[in-house]
Amino acid sequence: MKRLLTTLIVLLGIFAGASAQKGLEINKVFGGKYINDPTVTETMMSGEQKFLRSHNLSTLATFRGESKTYSPILQPLVLADGTNAIGRNVRYRDGKLQYAFFILKPVETGGKKINRYLYYLNNENSKRPSAMLIYFDGSLSRTQAESLIRSLKK
């Protein structure tokens, strides 16, 4: 019985996270689509995870891949999702999106307001060029979201 209850809670957490992410273009890169590429790192967290709880998160999804290959894929998806953002901080270099932080419109799930954030960084000029995408949602504020991004970039 305890195992069944735990399974149901985990599934509910996954559903809640997926519903907040529903309708976003960035979903096209998640789900293991590029996992056969050894340069790609993908992480998806939802449900009752200690890290999520400690940061007031419901969902955390990250994608990192080689800049040359993945920035042309990620950039249009990020910009499409950022079109209707309620807050933004965007930087271009040489006509390419270098940095973006979007505050997406909140959604309501199970009677709770879920704040949603999207972060993109293209480090094409670094020693190890990479394009990184981070989506996260939860009850955290903008200030908490910015602090979380700083901690994840380290």
Regions found by a protein language model. Give the residues of each.
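Bacterial Sec-dependent N-terminal signal peptides
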Residues: M1-I26
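Mid-chain, structured segments of secreted extracytoplasmic proteins
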Residues: F63-E108
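Sec/Tat-exported extracytoplasmic proteins
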Residues: D81-G82, N123, L152
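Solvent-exposed coil/turn segments that connect beta secondary-structure elements
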Residues: P106, N122-N125, D137-S139
